[in-house]
Amino acid sequence: MKKIGLLFMLCLAALFTIGFPAQQADAAEAPYKASITNISTDGGVYGKINYGQGQYWRVKYNITVSGKLLDQNGQPVPNAPVRFEADTKVGNTTQTASGTTDANGTFEVPMYLGPAAGYYTYYTSVSVHYYDIIPFRVFSGESRLVSTDNSLYHFAYQVRR
């Protein structure tokens, strides 16, 4: 009987220590919404693409995030702080960049991501692409915002066939 009780306690302890991934900010709690209109990058990998895990921006080392901050009524939010975070695979680091919206609520924030590891592969007729899928978060002040984009394809390299 003691073994069953001990086993139950261990299972219960394991149940409460399991971690869950961070989720999108709750729209009811977030003061603003970040509408990302463009993410430009270096390395000739510009634009959104679908490698099979969803339609995400494909980026390399350096990016510039452009968009607009909107309040809950869809109106632009002028002169507000905006911060971006991305968790990269090389070194398991969180990269951050900050900026401020202009008088029209728009932002354009440069951000350094560094190199990607290339844990995922995508095969084309002429090459193989190696990339990571990294979480991408947006904040204003300490509040996590609802965003149009929450993940990025962090491009590592390609091998021509």
Swiss-Prot record:
InterPro entries for the chain: CarboxyPept-like_regulatory (IPR008969), Ig-like_fold (IPR013783)
Localization, UniProt: Secreted
Induction, as annotated: Transcriptionally regulated by SigD.
Stretch forming the signal peptide: 1-27
Secreted found in the keyword field: yes
One GO location term (cellular component): extracellular region
SUPFAM superfamilies reported in the protein's UniProt record: Carboxypeptidase regulatory domain-like
Coiled coil start-end: none
Keyword Metal-binding: no
Protein name: Uncharacterized protein YlqB
Originating organism: Bacillus subtilis (strain 168)
Source lineage: Bacteria, Bacillati, Bacillota, Bacilli, Bacillales
